[in-house]
């Protein structure tokens, strides 16, 4: 039992969702280990929201993610489907059969060298009840290219009920791929996989005291968009009234030289968005791409972050960092905000799609205060879009939920001496919360804004990629590259927003799809999609786009 926490069950559907999830759980694990060294945890976030306690066959207490994960055959590499934490090696060694034995050996997957330094007992509390985590080294430059699957860098143990492999499809290879939305829907129409998912849901849900809802990390670009749609439908049918927050994940970049892959991506994304919005509290696309269309725009740019957009290991780390920040409101110990409440704030009047934006890392400089930095950002929209919607500057914001984390209390308000002329109205504020609220009011007057200011930074300890060259261990911006250990934590400014930029994004997607000659892509339709389904999807996509016209607002 979670002891009063408002539990959340996480579902990860797809291989890129596995990449994002691996970084996400590594960050949670690193945050649990903050009591090590000389670091004091502010205790603002409640880990019991995401984790569950358990006990092994030998009585050892465990603390594992409340997680159901679905991926394809060949995606686990050396990770065992049942995990390692609850295995009884004595039982495994016992052989009851007395007859002749024949041995068939299959070459084991070589363990990725990046895993050699990872902790072997993650997810286990020590005898004194404290959490112990071991610092590990950064993955060496050049070796990041060797990371092919998310299990190569996952550093936490999972419960035996977490991993579900869809054996009828292959993760790698030219054939047997889960490529189309219709294929994904069909997976959960098979009793074998549907019953397995239902059993796992019941296992986790029945042990919760107060389940506030589900966070669904789902690949949109391939057949897992169909798996996600059927999963969201199941959650709505079985657990009506609970929040279902869906994060639609899109890797990148895309090549113009792969027409079938691009057309399938476009169709899967559109069908996924439409069906998921029908069964979710809201859907937030997450991508470092510049747009959703067939002609890719350059990946997004972060001024202080150097990443390789061709590496899923890099892209997923950035998206996980944003996700770890924007989900803060329903993971706080002190806040009464639930998933359902957050969705109500953002998704009124049919606006079931929201965007994610972030500054990673927030440019905190030693000696400066929060009013100083926000004033320097000026009136321009400071965030980088993470939803393939392009620059949000000039577009209307209807509602937003904003989180600024990793700012120490001494920097919350102005440090100017009494009598010094104030550079801005922000410098007159008496608290950090007031500074942030005033800044958002200046940025978007008359917009419904929910904001949270946290002391807790975002953990970016290894195996998180080494993105940051001019930052201290605690994420402070510096003029030169510091010597010593890698950056361990960073301040992050993140937002979920309902914005008129979605009118163009969704409308353009519908227009591109309406120009397709579906006769050329009969293989997609043969996977289980009818012409009527296509027409209904286009109609719904246009309807969604209309919800975000400039004239639409909370007041009318």
Swiss-Prot record:
Short name of any one Pfam family annotated for the protein: Tubulin_3
Modification sites for Phosphoserine: 41
Keyword annotations: Cytoplasm, Membrane, Mitochondrion, Mitochondrion outer membrane, Phosphoprotein
Biological process terms in GO annotation: mitochondrion distribution; mitochondrion organization
Subcellular location: Mitochondrion outer membrane; Cytoplasm
InterPro entries: DML1/Misato (IPR049942), DML1/Misato_tubulin (IPR029209), Misato_II_tubulin-like (IPR019605), Tubulin/FtsZ_GTPase_sf (IPR036525)
CDD domains with a match to the protein in the record: misato
Protein role: Involved in the regulation of mitochondrial distribution and morphology. Required for mitochondrial fusion and mitochondrial network formation.
Protein's UniProt name: Protein misato homolog 1
């Amino acid at each position: 039992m979670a002891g009063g926490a408002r539990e959340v069950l996480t579902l990860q559907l797809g291989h890129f969702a596995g990449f994002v999830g691996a970084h996400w759980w590594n960050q949670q694990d690193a945050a649990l280990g903050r009591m090590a060294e000389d670091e004091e945890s502010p205790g603002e976030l409640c880990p019991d929201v995401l984790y569950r306690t358990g006990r092994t066959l030998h009585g050892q207490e465990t603390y594992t993610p409340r997680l159901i994960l679905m991926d394809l055959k060949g995606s686990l590499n050396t990770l065992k489907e049942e995990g390692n934490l609850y295995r009884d090696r004595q039982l495994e060694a016992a052989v009851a059969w007395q007859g002749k034995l024949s041995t068939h050996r299959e070459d084991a997957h070589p363990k990725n060298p990046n895993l050699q330094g990872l902790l072997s007992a993650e997810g286990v509390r020590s005898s004194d009840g404290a959490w112990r985590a071991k610092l590990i080294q950064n993955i060496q430059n050049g070796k990041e290219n060797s990371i092919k699957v998310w299990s190569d860098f996952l550093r936490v143990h999972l419960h035996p009920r977490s991993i579900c492999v869809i054996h009828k499809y292959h993760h790698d290879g030219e054939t047997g791929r889960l490529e189309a939305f219709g294929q994904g829907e069909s997976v959960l129409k098979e009793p074998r996989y549907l019953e397995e998912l239902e059993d796992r849901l019941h296992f986790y849900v029945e042990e919760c005291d107060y389940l506030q809802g589900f966070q669904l990390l789902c690949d949109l670009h391939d057949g897992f968009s169909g798996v996600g749609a059927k999963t969201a439908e199941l959650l709505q049918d079985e657990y009506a009234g609970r929040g279902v927050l869906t994060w639609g994940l899109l890797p990148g970049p895309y090549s113009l030289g792969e027409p079938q892959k691009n057309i399938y991506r476009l169709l899967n994304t559109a069908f996924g968005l439409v069906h998921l919005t029908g069964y979710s509290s809201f859907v937030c696309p997450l991508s470092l791409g510049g747009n959703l269309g067939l002609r890719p725009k350059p990946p997004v740019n972060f001024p202080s972050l150097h990443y390789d957009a061709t590496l899923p290991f890099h892209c997923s780390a950035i998206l996980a960092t944003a996700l770890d920040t924007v989900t803060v409101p329903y993971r706080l110990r002190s806040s009464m905000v639930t998933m359902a409440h957050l969705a109500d704030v953002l998704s009124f009047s049919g606006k079931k799609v929201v965007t994610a934006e972030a500054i990673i890392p927030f440019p905190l400089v030693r000696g400066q205060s929060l009013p100083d930095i926000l004033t320097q950002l000026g009136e321009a929209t400071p965030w980088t879009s993470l939803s393939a919607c392009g620059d949000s500057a000039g577009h209307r914001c209807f509602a937003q939920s904003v989180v600024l984390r990793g700012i120490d209390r001494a920097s919350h308000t102005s440090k100017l001496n009494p009598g010094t002329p104030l550079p801005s109205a922000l410098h007159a504020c008496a608290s950090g919360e007031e500074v942030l609220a005033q800044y958002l009011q200046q940025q978007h007057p008359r917009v419904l804004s929910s904001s949270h200011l946290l002391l807790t930074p975002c953990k970016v300890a290894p195996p998180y990629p080494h993105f940051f060259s001019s930052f201290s261990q605690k994420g402070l911006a510096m003029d030169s590259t510091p010597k010593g250990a890698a950056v361990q934590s960073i301040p992050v400014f993140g937002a979920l927003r309902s914005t008129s930029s979605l009118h163009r994004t969704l409308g353009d997607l519908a227009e591109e799809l309406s120009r397709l000659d579906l006769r050329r892509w009969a293989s997609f339709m043969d996977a289980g999609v009818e012409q009527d389904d296509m027409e209904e999807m286009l109609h719904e996509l246009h309807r969604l786009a209309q919800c975000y016209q400039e004239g639409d607002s909370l007041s009318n």
